Every structure is written in C-alpha cells, then in structure tokens.
Amino acid sequence: MTSKDIIENVEKRRTFAIISHPDAGKTTITEKVLLFGNALQKAGTVKGKKSGQHAKSDWMEMEKDRGISITTSVMQFPYKDRLVNLLDTPGHEDFSEDTYRTLTAVDSCLMVIDAAKGVEQRTIKLMEVTRLRDTPIITFMNKCDRETRDPVDLMDEVEAILNIACAPITWPIGMGKEFKGIYDLLRDEVILYSSGQGHTIQEVRIIKGLDNPELESVLPNHIHDLREELELVVGASHQFDHELFLKGQLTPVYFGTALGNFGVDHVLDGLVEWAPKPLSRAAKQRVVEPLEDVFSGFIFKIQANMDPRHRDRIAFMRVCAGKYEKGMKMHHVRTGKMVSISDAVTFMAGDRTATEEAYPGDIIGLHNHGTIQIGDTFTSGETLKFAGIPNFAPEMFRRIRLLDPLKQKQLLKGLMQLSEEGAVQVFRPLRSNDLIVGAVGVLQFEVVVQRLKSEYKVDAIYEAISVATALWVESDNPLKMAEFEKKAYDNLALDGSNNLAYIAPTMVNLNLAMERYPDIRFRKTREH
C-alpha cells in the first residue's frame, strides 16, 4: 500500500527540460520561468549586460565568460499548487552528449524556437532524442518583439520537419515593433503586451472576448486582420488533444518574448496543467512505478567542482520511485555495496541546500568521491538496472600531450574524472601510452584543457591525430572476439570505463574491418 505522502507528492511534481538551438533564448526563458515561479527576485540576463549580473543558471567560469550554458543546472521551484523541477540543458552544440542524457531524466520538454529563424539544426537533433521515449513537448515561439517569420509558416515548419502536430494555444498580435500582445484561443482573451525588463513583471491588461468592442479602440490597426487570421488558423490547425500530447504526437504552441517577460507564464500554466506527473521507468528487470514504496533512482550526470571552494563532484540522481530520506541506506547496484546517504543536496542554480527528503521526479545531488558513474542505479535493496542512459560515439579526436612529463599521473586522473562526468571521452590505445580525447564538438576540447589547468594544475596541449571514428565492439562469440582482439590489436583502445573500442583511422578501414569480422558488433552508442 503506497503511503499517502508519496501519492500526494508525486501528484504535485512536474519535471521538464528546456531544449533549443543555441541563441534561441533558452537561458533567458529559464530565468523568466524562475522569475514567474518567484525563485529569482532579479532575473540575470545573459551576455553583454553591463550590470555584472550573470544569469543565475550559468555558473562555471567559462560559461560566465562566454554567455552560454555549458553544464546542466537543476532548479526546483513552486508554481501554483505544483512543484516544478526544471533542468536547464546546454544549448551550445558542443555539449550535446550532456543534453542527450539529461533528456532521459525528465517527463516532458519545453522546446524554445527563435521566431525569426524557425526550426534549426540542433532542435532537430534534440527532438530525435526525445523521440526515443516519446516525451511530451510544449513549444514556445520566442522573440516575438523582434522581426519574425509568419506564425503560420513557423507552425507548418515544425509539423513538416519535426513530424509533430501543432495546436496553437496563444497567437501573436503583430510582430516586431508592431507586437501588441497575444490572443489566448482556449480562454478567448486578448492579453496586451507591456514589456517588463529584468525582474519586473508588468501588470497586463486582459480584454475578454475577440468580439469585444473595446478592441476596436485598443487595437485599431490590428483587430480586423487578427479576427480574419484566427478564423483561418482555427479552421486549418489542430485542436489541442491531451492524449496525443502525452504520446509525444502533438505540441501545444505559445508565442511571446522571454526577454520582455511576456507569454512565459502562459507556458508555465500549460505545463503544470498538462505535462505528466512523474512517469514509470523501464529497468532491465521490470518496469518501476513511481508510487512504489521502495526507493530507486539512477545517475544521469556527474559534474565536477560545482563549488569552487570545494573540490568535489556531484552525481545527479533522478528519483524514480519511493522516497529519499536523509541518512537512509541505499544499495549501489553496480558495486554491490550498501551506502548511507546523509548529505544529498537539491539545487537552485548554483546554490545548493541539504535535502531532508525527495520524491519521484526530484533531482538530488550525491557527493561523489570517484565511486559513482553515469548510469548507476541506487535502490533500497533490490538489484535493478535502469535502461536507456546512452553514451554516444565522439565525432572529433585529438591526442593530448603534457608540457610537463612528470604530471602524467595527474593528467590521467583528471581525464578519467572528466570522462566519468561525461564532459569528454578518453581512449587509451592498447599499443601505446597515448591518450586520445574524443568529443562531439570543438568547444569540449577547450573546456578540458582549461579544466585540467584550473582543477588539476596540469598544462596540456593537443596534437592532431588521424582518427575517423571510435566505435565500441562486442560479440556473443568469445572465440571470434579473442581472434579479433589479436588481429586488430593495433586499432583497439580502452575507454574511460575500460570498454573495448575500435579506433578507425579512416572510414574505409572501418568498413573493411566490419566485412572481415562479421561476428563483431561495432556500436555507435553504449549504454552506461
């Protein structure tokens, strides 16, 4: 019998991530979501503001310098009668692996699209990842106070490229300098735009009913076009259907401007009303329901040095079932050990607080002294392994070299920790002492060198290396595997978790190897 306490808390929670192409305004909307949830008294805007007030969710040194969110932040705040867990994901394409994994820890996503640009490359890639679990998607068309594309075209593009039906919930009145507000199709209300900058939320004027004669004087140049346009839109677009939304087949669409603090609260209203409460999770052994009395959770991310004053690493855990209580004993399934966790933390973008309890849907941080890895499962006793937390094959490679050869030990330690954290992947060729670093984008290489220097006092540089790809190898036939390991020895390497990978200098070489060894599987992803 599930306790009333767990039932009530699961009912209240909504856990979601914000996904977008870089510069679509994702970090700004994160700020404003927190502002409307009263979690921030003063929302810091991102990049180029003279006030020295940095966005609250960007907190590693390099992020402060560049104005991009490199690591995933977790923020919890109350909104109406719900408790919202928001995971801010890196928008910069170079940090996509982290983002992919974060999407395994949420129950819904808010997709932010720049209304001037429409669907962009990174959004397409992220939507592919959400498709793996049919995650429900809410869409926010941002920057309506700038010159934008036609809203009908934007929705058509989302439907055509992302293969998801669009149901408009709010509709823009004018665009750019002529942006006057939005019309809420479900409530039949016109909400007039008044810009609020930073942490000011302006009182908005709401006029009930599209036929209200008051609109003739308030919107003399727009009301006629708006009524005509809406007639067409309502006739041609999809109605909101909650079932289809929960299956990831239809997205409610909102318009607004995050920088002007306008339209964000409507999205939040939709999110807390429609997004699913914490969902069940597939483990290898069985499906885990959130309302179980027994505790379970999995690690989807490890982050080093979140607090410059403490040289520590935090493992981020999604609670899947049961209840975490301070001091409880947990079974760390991979190591087989029972551990007592008394110092778990919750986050408010860089400000961490010790937590007494956590429920399904919550994200808690465990202090990690090198024993926890991405994909690890913790339970209150049962041997479970949650499925589907992927590692993706890197696309770019460099050899890393020390400026001071005596620091080899520190270099290895630093690289291993950074690879466990998922910041980068490390491969150690069997035939040499080289260290090959693999990443999904160039910026990751910069981050690694910078963090090796600031956190491990190691000066390192990169050298070019001819590697086309690195794929994990496995086989059901031990004899064939042994033969392969012997013959392909020069091309084999161990990754940070000691899994065997094939390092292909060219794609031609890889294709030949795949033909020559049909019993060996070459894999682009590896589950943690």
Curated annotation (Swiss-Prot):
It is found in: Cytoplasm. GTP binds at residues 20-27, 88-92, 142-145. Residues 11-279 form the tr-type G domain. Increases the formation of ribosomal termination complexes and stimulates activities of RF-1 and RF-2. It binds guanine nucleotides and has strong preference for UGA stop codons. It may interact directly with the ribosome. The stimulation of RF-1 and RF-2 is significantly reduced by GTP and GDP, but not by GMP. GO terms for molecular function: GTP binding; GTPase activity; guanosine tetraphosphate binding; translation release factor activity, codon nonspecific; translation release factor activity, codon specific. This is Peptide chain release factor 3. Coiled coil: none annotated. Keywords: Cytoplasm, GTP-binding, Nucleotide-binding, Protein biosynthesis. One of its GO terms (biological process) is regulation of translational termination. Its main location: cytoplasm. InterPro entries: EF-G-like_DII (IPR053905), EFG_III/V (IPR035647), G_TR_CS (IPR031157), P-loop_NTPase (IPR027417), PrfC (IPR004548), RF3_C (IPR032090), RF3_dom_3_sf (IPR038467), RF3_GTP-bd (IPR041732). PROSITE patterns: G_TR_1 (PS00301), G_TR_2 (PS51722). Signal peptide: none annotated. The keyword Protein biosynthesis applies. Belongs to the TRAFAC class translation factor GTPase superfamily. Classic translation factor GTPase family. PrfC subfamily. It holds the Pfam family EF-G_D2. GO terms for cellular component: cytosol.
